[in-house]
Regions:
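Short acidic/histidine-rich active-site segments
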Residues: 57-72
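Active-site core of metal-dependent hydrolases
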Residues: 1-40
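Mid-to-C-terminal alpha-helical segments outside catalytic/metal-binding sites
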Residues: 85-124
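Short beta-alpha connecting loops at secondary-structure transitions
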Residues: 32-38, 60-62, 78-83
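Anion (oxyanion) recognition and catalysis
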Residues: 22, 53-54
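A post-motif C-terminal structural segment
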Residues: 31, 50-53
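Charged helix-capping and loop-helix junction motifs
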Residues: 42-50
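Short acidic alpha-helix initiation/capping motifs at coil-to-helix transition points
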Residues: 69-75, 89-91
Length: 124
């Protein structure tokens, strides 16, 4: 099986695939602004990110060649949060998923996850 699926935008079209992705927790990297630039989506409100979260999938938000597609990671989070009216909890889950689904060594993942938890504890 795959270690990670980049984009995975059309994965939501297949209920059997959704089940496999949920069961395996295979990370899906979603790049909202490049999807818009490349006309994968004509409107960010059609992004599968919120539904993927609601389905219990391991989705995260990424930038994809930000110099070409007009947005680094913060801009992608801002755009998708506004378009999908994501909750603070959903944003935190996306951030956590970005580290748990990364290829970082486990000790590095733990360090970054602890930092997220610390910020959340202080602010939410």
């Amino acid at each position: 099986g795959a270690d990670r699926i980049d984009h995975g935008t059309r994965a939501m079209e297949d209920p059997a695939l959704i089940e496999v992705l949920r069961d395996t927790q295979t990370p899906l990297t979603n790049c909202p602004l490049s999807n818009l630039s490349l006309c994968v989506l004509d409107d960010l409100r059609k992004s599968p990110v919120k539904r993927q979260l609601e389905e219990g999938l391991h989705v995260c938000v990424n930038s994809d060649d930000p110099a070409y597609f007009g947005g680094y990671i913060g801009k992608n989070y801002e755009a998708i949060t506004e378009a999908l009216d994501l909750s603070a909890q959903q944003i935190v889950q996306l951030a956590r998923n970005s580290f748990t689904g990364s290829f970082l060594p486990e000790n590095q993942k733990a360090k970054h996850l602890a930092r997220i938890d610390s910020v959340v504890e202080d602010r939410l």
